[in-house]
Amino acid sequence: MSKPTITVIVPVYKAMATLDRCVESIVSQQTEEPIACILVDDGSPDDSGKMCDAWAARDPRVTVIHQEDRGVSGARNAGLAAAGSEYIVFLDSDDALRPGALQAALDAQRRAPHSLVCWQYTTEEADTAPVTSAAE
């Protein structure tokens, strides 16, 4: 696999209910550049770590770091230390990217290279029904 342009770092702790949706939304992104996903199992006491390992076994773009609980900042920092890409995206394990989100972010960054790229979001309940949306 060639060096990724974008790495998505996901801290994982007690995320069994949401992890598959999160990772699927990452690995299904259509991008012109290679992407990677780093799942940081932050000492989760449930089977979230095993779920991370299963994703890594299925998709070579997914890697897993297992560590003792260091909190979300410690997990993000571990992911940053392991990433070797030009761009970093942080995603929480209960989040999901919309189709095309990574390519849109990459395009926006390249149009304005000294900028921070942010995008809109939708808050959903457990049944994934939209509740609120951020302004575009």
What role is predicted for each listed range?
Residues 1-136:
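Nucleotide-sugar donor-binding/catalytic module of glycosyltransferases
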